[in-house]
């Protein structure tokens, strides 16, 4: 990811995205540069319009909207569990104990 970040930084600074410039940015950040990755990223970004990609990336819907639905489902499940526990209770321990004490009179 740091290679992409370096490329975006160069793009924002209006600098050429080249192997040398990416390497300089990564080295300045104290990152050990992998020459294979460096060449792959530089070659992949040569014919890419980064401005266009950034526009489409910001236009994509965010998935965070789905999170509240999950909370509602969890809350509903918790309420069902509480109802089941209340239904299962039956007679209390005192009621059961009172019936047994009459046996030993």
Curated annotation (Swiss-Prot):
Keyword DNA repair appears in the UniProt entry: no
Biological processes per GO annotation: translational elongation
Segments of skewed composition (Basic and acidic residues): 77-92
GO molecular function: structural constituent of ribosome
Region named Disordered: 65-105
UniProt-listed CDD domains: Ribosomal_L12p
InterPro entries for this protein: P1/P2_N_sf, Ribosomal_P1/P2, Ribosomal_P1_arc
Residue(s) carrying Blocked amino end (Met): 1
Entry keyword annotation includes Ribonucleoprotein: yes
One Pfam family cited in the UniProt record for this chain: Ribosomal_60s
Listed Low complexity bias regions: 65-76
Entry keyword set: Ribonucleoprotein, Ribosomal protein
An annotated GO cellular component: ribosome
Domain of life of the source: Archaea
Similarity comment text for this entry: Belongs to the eukaryotic ribosomal protein P1/P2 family.
Description of how the protein assembles with itself and partners: Part of the 50S ribosomal subunit. Homodimer, it forms part of the ribosomal stalk which helps the ribosome interact with GTP-bound translation factors. Forms a heptameric uL10/P0(P1)2(P1)2(P1)2 complex, where uL10/P0 forms an elongated spine to which the P1 dimers bind in a sequential fashion.
Function: Forms part of the ribosomal stalk, playing a central role in the interaction of the ribosome with GTP-bound translation factors.
Protein name from the UniProt record: Large ribosomal subunit protein P1
Source organism per UniProt: Sulfolobus acidocaldarius (strain ATCC 33909 / DSM 639 / JCM 8929 / NBRC 15157 / NCIMB 11770)
Gene: rpl12
């Amino acid at each position: 990811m740091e290679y992409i970040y370096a490329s975006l930084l160069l793009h924002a600074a209006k600098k050429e995205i080249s192997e040398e410039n990416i390497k300089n940015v990564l080295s300045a950040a104290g990152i050990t540069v992998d020459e294979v990755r460096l060449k792959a990223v530089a070659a992949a970004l040569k014919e890419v319009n980064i401005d266009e990609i950034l526009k489409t990336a910001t236009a994509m819907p965010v998935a965070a909207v789905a999170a509240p639905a999950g909370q509602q489902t969890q809350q509903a499940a918790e309420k069902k569990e509480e109802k089941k526990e209340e239904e299962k209770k039956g007679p209390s321990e005192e009621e059961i104990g009172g019936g047994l004490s009459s046996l030993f009179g």
